[in-house]
A protein has these predicted regions:
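Extreme N-terminal leader/targeting segments of oxidoreductases
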Residues: 1-11, 29-30, 51-52, 380-384, ...
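Mid-domain catalytic core of redox enzymes
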Residues: 6, 238-371
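N-terminal Rossmann-like FAD-binding beta1-loop-alpha1 element of flavoenzymes
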Residues: 9-35
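Glycine-rich FAD pyrophosphate-binding loop
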Residues: 28-52
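N-terminal glycine-rich dinucleotide-binding loop that anchors FAD/FMN and/or NAD(P) in oxidoreductases
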Residues: 49-75
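Conserved flavin/dinucleotide-binding core of flavoenzymes
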Residues: 50, 107-108, 326-458
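Mobile amphipathic helical/loop "lid" adjacent to a hydrophobic cofactor/ligand pocket
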Residues: 69-187, 194-195
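Helical element adjacent to the flavin cofactor pocket in flavoenzyme catalytic cores
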Residues: 195-254, 259
Length: 458
């Protein structure tokens, strides 16, 4: 495509997570782009922290950490395109319940039976039996149309899975992946859960995908995009409202200052996008309000008491739980970052999400809040309708909430918006470039009587 033939449009992108960054990056090749970010840094969940430890600088991620080539095809192609170094990493998983009363990891027999009493524990063997049954039956369950409208909890009850498998393995894994309380995982749509686990190789013992990370942290790709957008980024920019008019869009900041744009891309969370729109349409109100969020506090620290008691079970992801009730257990996840990233220290560096107790003050480094989509039946059903919002009143939406809530979902939505709004193809080829989100071809849709791509191409 001859990018020089595209008539440049003045476009605002709101939000600098992976969706906003990728969208602005591609649009910038032919259009006048301004990227707005309310915080003092770019990246959203790509948040690398640098700190000094015993005279050595350590760079560690606290949000986005890992990806794999099978399930993150656009992210891999993007990293290759910008020549970003990556390396293989480990993705082991451990469980520690009630201060170490039950502990095991998935790293072979030594991890499963790190506690010798697990060898002679009938409930533990029952958990393993159910685990293998779940793996074995997953494909057939995904083909069962009667499961289309039931929750994960209903599926597990219907199939007769035991509490030990449900509460000591499956829900801990789900809660760790989605940063979601156990009770919410039970309400997660069953087929969506199964498809995600199947696609990510979580329903098999062997041949799981090889995971990768970015040496030096995800700040590496953020800096590369920022360099291309130099002079077009506005940090600490809190927008009061977005006003749509027939001829374009007005952004008004907290001080009442206004700026006009031809188009706007709301690359923020669904609830944030809805709050910014001065006069949302009924469809925008209905769809965007159906995506609730879970606020999670992350602590970067050195407190090893927030890892399993038995060091032999320490893993990349460590699920920690406490409480006698199964549904209302206090749960958290601690990431052993030395296992996940090549760090310049052997001192255990830990990121704990919603820990059962706060790290000791003298071992604390930083803390952050991250919001994650808490998908339910309504939100997952409404994902199929989200693309109907695109382009109306010169307004576009993207974000990881268009898919499963991960980096690949964010970049797929950001690039798809840039392609349809800006008329610029991504600089790589994939058989299914939007495999994780629902995208429709706007060439068949009308927007105020003007086709989007015709407008972009003049």
């Amino acid at each position: 495509m001859n990018i020089a033939a595209i008539r440049p449009r003045k476009i605002a992108v709101i939000g600098s997570g992976i969706a906003g960054l990728s969208c602005a990056w591609l649009l910038n090749k032919a259009h006048q782009v301004t990227l707005y970010e309310k915080d003092d840094r770019l990246g959203g969940h790509s948040n690398t922290v640098s700190f000094d430890l015993k005279g050595q600088q350590v760079d560690v991620d606290t949000g986005f950490i890992v990806f794999n080539p099978v399930n993150y095809p656009n992210l891999v192609k993007f990293f290759e395109h910008i020549n970003l170094p990556t390396c293989e990493t480990d993705m082991t998983f451990a469980v520690s319940i009630n201060d170490g009363q039950l502990e095991y990891s998935g790293s072979g027999l030594g991890g499963l039976f790190a506690q010798k009493r697990n060898l002679i524990s009938p409930p533990f063997w029952s958990m393993l039996k159910d685990l293998m049954r779940f793996y074995r039956n997953a494909d057939n369950m995904m083909l069962d149309s009667s499961l289309a409208d039931i929750s994960l909890g209903e599926l597990l009850q219907r199939q007769g899975y035991g509490d030990r498998f449900i509460y000591d393995h499956l829900l801990p894994m789900g809660a760790a992946i989605w940063s979601t309380p156990v009770k919410q995982m039970l309400d997660y749509p069953a087929l969506s859960f199964l498809r995600f686990c199947k696609n990510h190789g979580l329903l098999q013992v062997n041949d799981r995908p090889q995971w990768h990370t970015i040496p030096g942290g995800s700040i590496g790709y953020v800096r590369k995009i920022a360099a291309e957008l130099e002079g077009k980024v506005r940090l600490n920019s809190r927008i009061h409202k977005v006003i749509r008019q027939p001829e374009g869009v007005i952004i008004e900041d907290l001080h009442g200052a206004r700026e006009y744009y031809d188009d706007i891309v709301l690359a923020c969370h669904a609830d944030q996008a809805l709050a910014l729109l001065a006069n949302p349409t009924p469809e925008e109100q209905q769809l965007l309000s159906s995506f609730p969020y879970q606020r999670n506090q992350a602590f970067l620290h050195l407190d090893q008491s927030l890892l399993p008691k038995d060091r032999k079970t320490w893993s990349s992801w460590n699920y920690m739980a406490s409480g006698s009730g199964l549904d209302d257990r206090q749960v958290s996840v601690s990431y052993w970052m030395n296992c996940l990233q090549p760090l310049a220290t052997e001192v255990p560096i830990i990121v704990s999400l919603n820990p059962l107790k706060e790290p000791a003050p003298e071992k604390m480094i930083r803390s952050f809040f991250y919001d994650h989509p808490a998908f339910g039946r309504d939100s997952l059903a409404n994902q199929q309708k989200l693309w109907n919002l695109q382009g109306h009143q010169n307004t576009w939406f993207c974000g990881a909430w268009f898919g499963y809530g991960f980096h690949e979902d964010g970049i797929q939505s950001g690039l798809a918006v840039a392609e349809q709004l800006g008329g610029i193809p991504r600089p790589w080829q994939l058989e299914e470039p939007s495999s994780r989100i629902f995208v429709t071809d706007l060439l068949t849709q009308e927007n105020d009587g003007t086709d989007r791509l015709e407008k972009a191409n003049g």
